[in-house]
């Protein structure tokens, strides 16, 4: 009877020690509330950038192409396009602001004809106001933008895994993904600018002559610029969180500490 009590006590001690060890390991693997709050704040910044990026890539108000108003005509034409489709609108000149020489802005009510670009399917160029797109440049801008969205999604997944599973080694990968997505968005914007210039120069030798055009970048492109900046900021924030804390403590000593 005495030996059985001894073995039972030893078994209880062993189980208690194992439970304490496992609890200590889980505590070491977990995130402190302060660090978890910083990561959540960085994720919130990244989500704002991701929302702007999806809004920019999914809409077709990257650039507006406006014809000049003509005397004796009650309507004029304007177009707005993005990465995937183009919309040509017929606007009433009476709705156009009086001090404006060109037709537009494209947000005015009017008859719209929207079509998706065919160079994603059949490889055909689009014709806008007797001008031809350069499909290679447009395709490059769209593909780079999609790669940026993919990197952004991977970054969000990495940060979510850090918060849910405590896998802090994924934080650096998430920082790289967010920074890469911001850079890819900026590259896509620059390539799209080149595609607009190529479109304006691609006049078809047809009759009647191609109308004069004026162009202006619209709010979708502004969302893309904002998304790129915010995603880069999010990547930098996550990268700073992966750095060791002791260099910053040495640069910012606590008040009231011992002095030499």
Swiss-Prot record:
> Example GO biological process term?
regulation of calcium ion transmembrane transport via high voltage-gated calcium channel
One Pfam family in the UniProt entry:
Claudin_2
Q: Which keywords describe this protein according to UniProt?
A: Calcium, Calcium channel, Calcium transport, Cell membrane, Ion channel, Ion transport, Membrane, Transmembrane, Transmembrane helix, Transport, Voltage-gated channel
Checking InterPro entries in the record gives: PMP22/EMP/MP20/Claudin, VDCC_g6su, VDCC_gsu
Q: How does it sit in the membrane?
A: Multi-pass membrane protein
- Output a single Gene Ontology CC term carried by this record: L-type voltage-gated calcium channel complex
Q: In which tissues is it expressed?
A: Detected in heart atrium and ventricle, aorta and skeletal muscle. Detected in heart left ventricle.
Which GO terms fall under molecular function for this chain's record? calcium channel activity; calcium channel regulator activity
Q: Localized where?
A: Cell membrane
Transmembrane stretches, start-end: 43-63, 143-163, 169-189, 221-241
| Keyword field contains Transport | yes
Subunit note: Interacts with CACNA1C. Identified in a complex with the L-type calcium channel subunits CACNA1C, CACNA2D1 and either CACNB1 or CACNB2.
Family named by the database record: Belongs to the PMP-22/EMP/MP20 family. CACNG subfamily.
According to its UniProt entry, the function of this protein is described as:
Regulates the activity of L-type calcium channels that contain CACNA1C as pore-forming subunit.
Q: Under what name is this protein listed?
A: Voltage-dependent calcium channel gamma-6 subunit
Q: Which organism is it from?
A: Rattus norvegicus
Q: Tell me the lineage of the source organism.
A: Eukaryota, Metazoa, Chordata, Craniata, Vertebrata
């Amino acid at each position: 009877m005495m030996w059985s009590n001894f073995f039972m006590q030893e078994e209880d001690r062993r189980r208690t020690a194992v439970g304490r060890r496992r609890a200590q390991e889980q505590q070491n693997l977990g995130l402190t509330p302060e660090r978890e709050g910083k990561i959540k704040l960085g994720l919130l910044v990244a989500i704002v950038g991701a929302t702007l990026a999806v809004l920019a890539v999914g809409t077709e108000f990257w650039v507006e192409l406006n014809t000049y108003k003509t005397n004796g005509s009650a309507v004029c034409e304007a177009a707005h396009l993005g990465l995937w489709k183009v919309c040509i609108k017929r606007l009433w000149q009476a709705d156009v602001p009086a001090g404006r020489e060109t037709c537009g802005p494209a947000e005015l009510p009017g008859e719209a004809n929207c079509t998706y670009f065919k160079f994603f399917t059949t490889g055909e160029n689009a014709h806008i106001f007797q001008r031809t797109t350069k499909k290679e440049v447009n395709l490059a801008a769209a593909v780079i933008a999609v790669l940026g969205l993919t990197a952004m999604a991977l970054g969000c997944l990495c940060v979510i895994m850090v918060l849910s599973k405590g896998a802090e080694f994924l934080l650096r990968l998430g920082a790289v993904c967010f920074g890469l997505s911001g850079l890819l968005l900026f590259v896509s914007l620059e390539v799209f600018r080149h595609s607009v210039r190529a479109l304006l120069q691609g006049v078809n030798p047809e009759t009647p002559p191609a109308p004069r055009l004026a162009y202006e970048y619209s709010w979708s492109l502004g969302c893309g610029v904002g998304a790129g900046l915010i995603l880069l900021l999010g990547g930098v924030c996550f990268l700073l969180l992966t750095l060791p804390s002791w260099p910053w403590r040495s640069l910012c000593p606590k008040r009231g500490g011992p002095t030499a």
